[in-house]
Amino acid sequence: MMKIAAKCCRIVMAFMAWTCAGAVGAQPLQFEPPPTPAAGRSAIPARPMASADLLAELRKGGYIIYFRHTSTDFSRDDSRSKSDDDCDNQRPLTDKGRAEAREIGAAFRDLKIPLVQVLASPRCRTMETAMLAFGKAEKSSEARAGPASPGNEDRYAPLRAVLSTPVKTGGNVAIASHGNPFIAVAGAPYLAEGEAAVIRPLGKDFEIVARVKHDGWRALARTN
């Protein structure tokens, strides 16, 4: 009987240890699950552009630079927001995010990367990112936030059209938006906060030539 009891005890202890290990190893989701790319499509793959070539190309113009807004306070969300201008009930930028946006703008000025237009999702965090970085922003309904839910995969068709349209003048277009719209039209991986995708419009589609973290812009000059 004692042997049976000891064996049962070992089994119970092993089960408890396995359960606890699973609980310790579990990690909470930090971001909302990204949607499936609209209509099963993603951007045309392109060979990554070398940093020196990227800076030279951006100085010539003709690219769209799609930013995800900089760092935000994830303890708040947009669930009670009544409108795009209802900033008190939306997830805001943190002080770190504001500093990141200013640094992005300073890097663009120092690197002499020309912008002919700055668009932004109407949400407060994206408008603030654009304003702090570049001093201007036009509200763009095409860059609005929200998932592409099943049966509504064409929600971001207007954004795909914007990213596919060639830039006509001698500069680049910056867009401050969100993670979900980008992954819906371009596919994985998800953009980090403050990260940008450099896009070459192709008329009927587009290709991504580079991804740059919020603190990676000045590195382009060091390789030029």
Protein language model features and the residues they cover:
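Bacterial N-terminal signal peptides that target proteins for export
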Residues: 2-15, 19
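C-terminal segment of classical bacterial N-terminal signal peptides
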Residues: 18-26
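Active-site-proximal alpha-helix that buttresses catalytic centers in soluble enzyme cores
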Residues: 29-141, 146-150, 188-198, 202-207, ...
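Generic beta-sheet signal
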Residues: 62-64, 171-177
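All-alpha RGS (Regulator of G-protein Signaling) helical domain and cognate RGS-like helical scaffolds
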Residues: 143-152, 156-164
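A polyampholytic, Gly/Pro-enriched intrinsically disordered region
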Residues: 158-169, 218-224
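A short, structured loop/turn motif at beta-sheet edges
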Residues: 165-171, 201-204
